[in-house]
Amino acid sequence: MSKISNLIDFYNGKSLNKDKVTSNSMKFTGNGILDYPKTRKKEVSQLTTLSNSDINIICNTLKIPLKGVFMKDEFKLPLQDGNYIMNLQDSHEGGSHWVAFIKNKSNIFYHDSYAVIMPQNQYDLFKSNQNNIYYNTLQKQSLETTSCGWWSIYFLYYMYYSKGTLQKRFINFNKMFEHKKTNEHVDIKMNKNEALLLKIFKEIYFS
């Protein structure tokens, strides 16, 4: 876990988002839960792209209190406490990659399954209230998958239902998954993570 506690020269005024575009219509139509008939949920073998509607349905089913699912240019100040899922493209675009964050008083807990620093406008939004920003620095998702929406949902699910301080929950969540070690091919670890995430959703959702 890393923390940005002050306006520092960390970001260099640039968006570091280099996420792979996984869909040109994520905002409206995904290949996720809406394509899964209820009678076949247990047969799901891969977590695919989710639209904003998919995400809302799943979060509602899992009883995750959600402030909303937004494109990155749709936020307004003041930012209220709560759970958010955000797409890293603007509202006039089709959508690229889902991330999640929690605002709790003066703290922001930001999770990107690719472990990429948030775009500049989100950094500015978070810091507008002099918030502390906690973010993950280790990649969990394979670049060959489109499961970012599922990663975002499970992050909020874990943070909401687990015990302990939010800082402790954030640390424990990141410890659950494999991370690339020196001289190790990243996809080996990431594929294990994808399999674990699918197993988790089969237990908490596809059952």
Put a short name on every predicted segment:
Residues G13, T22-V99, K103-I108:
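Cysteine protease catalytic domains with a Cys-His-Asp triad
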Residues S5-I8, N12:
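Residue-level detector of alpha-helical secondary structure
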Residues N83-Y160, G164:
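Cysteine protease-like catalytic core of ubiquitin/ubiquitin-like
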Residues M1, F28-G30, Y36, R40-E43, ...:
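Terminal export signals
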Residues I133-F206:
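C-terminal folded domains that constitute the principal catalytic or ligand-binding module
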Residues D54, N121-L125, N172, L196:
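Exposed alpha-helical structural elements
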Residues D54-K63, F126-Q130, L156, Y205:
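Hydrophobic, Leu/Ile/Phe/Ala-enriched alpha-helical segments that form helix-helix packing faces
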